[in-house]
C-alpha cells in the first residue's frame, strides 16, 4: 500500500510500512539499488497509481506488480482475487503507465496476459512499444516462463516449473537435471501449446502469453486449463479483413 494504514492491513503486521521505509532510506543513503515488489488483490488494487508515485519518489530502480497466484498462503485469500474485467483494466493501466515511463523499470509479474495487451494496444495505436530492461531483470519477452525458460530446485531436490507451481517434474537426487529439463512429461506438456485447453488452446496469443499455468493448476486442478484471470475471447482482436480471410 501507499500508506502505513493500507500496507500494514495488507501485511497483517503493524509497523511493516515503517520498517520498509527505513530499509529504503538506508539503501538510498548507501547508494544501493533496490526494486519494490507489490502484490495486488481487491483490498489494494485501487492503490496502484498511488504506489507508483511513491515508488518514483523513493527512487527505486524497478517496480514489479505481482498478480496473486493462489498457492501457499495465497490459498487463504482466494476470495480477494481481482475480478477478470478489473484485472484487464489494471493491465491496460500498466501499459499506459509503462509507455510513458523512461526511468523506472516496471513489470507486471505472474500476469502473462500483459504480453497480449502490449501486442493488441501497440497494433491498435500503430506504435512500436520498446520495453526497458535491466541486467538483473527477468521476463520481458513473453508471458509464462514456467518450465520453458525457468524452473526452480527446492531444498529437497525437486525440480518445479516455478516457485508457485507445487507439482514437481522430477528430482535431481534420482536423475540428472538435463534429463528432467529435456524429457519430463510435465515440462513437455507445458511447452506444447497445442495441449492447452479451452480459450488458451484456441487463442492466437498463446505463444506470447500462455496463461499462468500455476494459477490454472491452483484454481482448477489442471495446469493445462485456461487462465482463470483472462477475460479475452480468442479471435476478438482480429480486424474485419483478417476475420473475412479466415472464413473464406
Regions found by a protein language model. Name each.
Residues 1-146, 152-156, 168-169:
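Radical SAM enzyme [4Fe-4S]-AdoMet core and its adjacent flexible, acidic
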Residues 158-159, 163-248:
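Flexible mid-to-C-terminal extensions adjoining Fe-S/redox cofactors in radical SAM and related proteins
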